[in-house]
Each structure stands twice: as C-alpha cells, then as structure tokens.
Amino acid sequence: MNNQISLNPQPSSLNLILSRTKVRGEYAHGHLSIDGLRICDTLENTNGLAPAGVYPITLIKCKHHSRKMPVLNPNAPCDRCPKCLIPNPSSLNHTLPCWCPMLKPGNGICGRLDGSILVGQFNCLGSLIHPKTVFDPLYERIRKSISRGNKVILCVK
C-alpha cells in the first residue's frame, strides 16, 4: 500500500494551496487558495517555515488555544502538548515551545519559530489585519470537509 499523497488534486478532498510570494528577512508573505480561488493572505517566519510539499491537515485539540486547530502534522507529538499550556497567558499571540505547524489567526510573526501559518488580510510587510474574520470561515470549511469524510490537503509551494 502506498502511503504517499499524490500531488494531483483529488475530487473527494479539499485542496488548499499556499503560494509564497514575497520573502524578505524573517517575513514570508503568501496567498492561500482553494481550487484556484484566492481565499486570504498568509504570513510566516522564515526561520520556522514548513518546507515546500504536500501536507494532510487534521483537526487536533490544542491545549494552548483550548480548541481544535488545523495542524499540518497528523502525527503531532501530543505528549508535548502539556508544554504548550501556558499558565495565565496574557495573549494567545505567544509562540508555542515546540515546532507544531498549524493554520491560525494572528497579525505578526515576530519571534515565532513554531511553524505557524498565520492567515488574514495583507496590511504591510510583516503584518496582517482581520485575522479572526478570515480564520473562522476557513476553519469551518476545513471542519465541515473533514466531518463529511473528505481529506484536507495543503500544498505548499
């Protein structure tokens, strides 16, 4: 049995495509699209980038965010999740202590080395605006696709 994921889109899957368009210093801006339709802008830290490739996305309960999050690594080390639980966090904009790439809302990547792919609308170099209003519909689309038994695949270019 072949466990590799095909680079060809599959009809029973939700295919997200992350195209990195601008890389300067520690900022990597890009666009997230579904079936050729641009959905939102992305922002990543170049020191913690997920390598180009194809990743299955799964929803895993994240103790840091206290909710299910779309994670690029289905074999996420959940035994490390207690390390991610920050006592009395002042903000959810903290970095995670281990490399756990996921799609999440956020407006800046300064100091983030956890592989996060932040979604929002491009504002200026290194900044996104309206991250929550962009993330919520994207999350619902991913959640509904998974609940219908479809695969969700992220292709990073």
Q: Positions of the model-derived regions?
A:
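Cell wall/extracellular polymer interaction/catalysis modules
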Residues: N2-V152
